[in-house]
Amino acid sequence: MTSRRRGTHDHRRTVVAASMLVMTKKIDAAVTRLRAGELVAFPTETVYGLGADARNPVALRKVYALKGRPATHPLILHLHSVDELVSWAAEVPPMALRLAARFWPGPLTLVLRRAAGVADELTGGQDPIAVRVPAHPVARALLAAFGSGIAAPSANRYGRVSPTRAAHVREEFPQDLLVLEGGDCEVGLESTIVSLVGATPQLLRPGVISSAALAAELGMSLQTPTSGAAPRVPGSTAQHYAPQTPLTLVPAGRLDTAIKTAQAGGELVVTLACPPGTDAASYGRALYAELRRLDKQGASRILVESVPKSADWDAARDRLARAAATFV
């Protein structure tokens, strides 16, 4: 009995060691490509990113070209440690250090004033720089091995549904792009973005780290800037995160009526419901994968039931509002 148990444990250790060796080789290959100015895709806890050497303007331009992304739409810089901030930000205010100590590594992006020498291609030509320290172990291993910052927007065509699985990235970019496997993304929605370039912090994009949690850590409320009064950040355009099939957002409780109306008009529709009691974190984790699945069904429209209006649904509600082509 004891020897059998020991044999099982030995086998598991061998499998784990072999898996670690394979991943180490893949990360080494990714680092080689990054240093050569090429692009790689890798997992984070939010979505899969399309990475480039953040110090290489030519590589950064490749990101914009491959995604079809406007050159004025900034990229998020990914770092391994908060200690690296001083190389990228002109100043690191105490508020930034407080939030980093509480929420990094994790799905929080801070917008700071950029340091001299930071490429315009990284910031979309504006002064502020957006930066975060991801929590996913593969992302962290890649950043540690690379030894510098990696710029990484979501690994999809601009404006489309973000990828939360390696297979999603390959669907977007079937050519010879190295994709590091990391399983399904744990969070599934993009990071919360907070600007600290002024005296009062501003919430620029909602995420799973809530405004209330940020305010509690800082001891002050966050402002929501008016349109055009804040730095440009990823995912801030009115139309974004959209499947190719037009998406219609339907008020809660009216999905059945919307289905009947669409079918009476001869439409083939697919649906995504949000039943009472649905957990916000689970919904957000699965949202993009489900939208991608529905997008392949050959329907004329995707009908999505609106999510609750409570604070824990802010991120999902924001993404659906931007993904929607029409509203009921």
Map each language-model feature to its residues.
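Active-site-adjacent structural elements in enzyme catalytic cores
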Residues: 14-328
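Intrinsic-disorder-associated, low-complexity terminal segments enriched in Asp/Asn/His/Tyr and depleted
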Residues: 9-11
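Polybasic, lysine-enriched low-complexity intrinsically disordered terminal tails
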Residues: 4-7
